[in-house]
Amino acid sequence: MSFEAEVAAALRASIAPATPIDFDDWALRVFAHQFEHVPAFRSFCERRGVTPSTIARWDDVPAVPARVFRSVDLACGSPEAVFRTSGTTGGPEARGRHAIPLLDLYRASAIPTFERFLLPDGVSLPCLFLLPPPALRPESSLVHMCGWVGEAFGTSVEWLAGSTGLDVARLTTRLAELEATGEAVLLAGPTAGFVRLFDNGTRVRLGPGSRLMDTGGQKGLDRPISRAGFLRACWTHLGIPTYYCVNEYGMTELCSQRYDSVLRDRFDGRSLAPRRLVGPSWLRTRILDPDTLDPVGPGATGLLCHHDLANAGSVSVVLTEDLGRTIADDGIEILGRVAGAIPRGCGQLLTELAQS
C-alpha cells in the first residue's frame, strides 16, 4: 500500500465521530513523506532550517504559496491525474498545475465532505451540473469531483455546459420539466453560471428538498453580485430556500473543500448558527498576517493558509492570496482577495522557493 493510500484509509476511518483523525501525527508523517519525495520542497525547507527532525507540531510545517503550483513540480510521484486552474491570464504556462499521484485520496476527502454538507438527509437526487462533462474538461478538479458525486448520489446525471459555455436554453427546459413533476433536484456549478440563468429571466418553483451548490466563481460576469443578492435570486428564480443554497470553497491546489454550514446546521438542530465555511477534520486553516505571516487574533482579517492532509501526494500546506477571518470555533469567512501587489509574506516565500 502506498503512503497516499494509507492516508486515504485514515481519512475514511475518521469519518465516524468515534474515530477522529490524529491531525498532529498525520501532519508530521505527511511532511516527512513530502520532504523525502519532493526535491524542490525539500530544498526550500532546508534553506529555512526545517526538517522532519526539527518540527514538533502541525503548524511548524512550512507553507508553500499557491502561485508556486504555476512553475514548480510538487508531486511526490508519477501522477494519476493532473488538474489545472482555470485562469487564463498570462497564457497556459501561468495556470496552476496540481499533479495527483493517487486519485482515490482526492475522492476519499471530497465525497464524504460533500455528503455531509449537501446531503445531510441521506437522499439521492437527479444531478444537473452547470459544467462541461469530464470528457471536455479532464483537467478540472471540480468537474472530476462532480462526476464522483453523480456516481455516488445521483439518480441521474446531466452536464449542461459544453465547449461554448452554459446551455441556458437546455437548462431552462430541464428545470421546467422538473418543476412540472415536483421532483427534488441537485444543482451544482459556478456562481456565474447561475447568475447567467437568472439574467435569462428563468423562473421556476423546484420541488421541496431541491438544493444548490455554487462554487463562488464570478469570472465573465458583467456585474458583481453579493452573497445576499445571490441567495435572494435563488429563491426568486428557482424557488430554492436560502438554507438549501450551499456555497463551496475549493482550490485546484487542494484536495479538500469547505462548505457553507447552513444545511448541515439545520439538520443538526442549529438553525441559528452563523453561516460559515466548514471543512473536514483533516483540513485546518490558519489566518495569517500578510506581511509577517504570523497568526492574527480571533476574528481579525488575514491571508488564508490551508493545511490539507489529503494533499499528501504534493504539499500539504498552501498559502493563498485569499483574505478571510475565523467564524465561531470551526469555520471561516472569505472576504475577498489581496488587491495589487503580492503580499510581502508571500513574496518572501516565493523568493526562497526560486532559490531552492
Predicted features along the sequence, with ranges:
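Short secondary-structure boundary/capping elements
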Residues: 77, 106-109, 166
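Active-site glycine/GP-rich loop and adjacent strand/helix microenvironment
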Residues: 1-11, 21-33, 39-40, 124-126, ...
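Hydrophobic alpha-helical segments that mediate membrane insertion or helix-helix packing
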Residues: 84-89, 260
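Active-site diphosphate/adenylate-binding microenvironment
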Residues: 33-84, 92-99, 112-121
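Long, hydrophobic, well-ordered secondary-structure blocks that form the structural core
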Residues: 96-139, 143-160
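Gly/Ser/Thr-rich beta-alpha loop segments that engage phosphate groups in nucleotides
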Residues: 89-92, 252
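Anionic, Ser/Thr-rich low-complexity intrinsically disordered regions
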Residues: 1-23, 56-59, 64-72
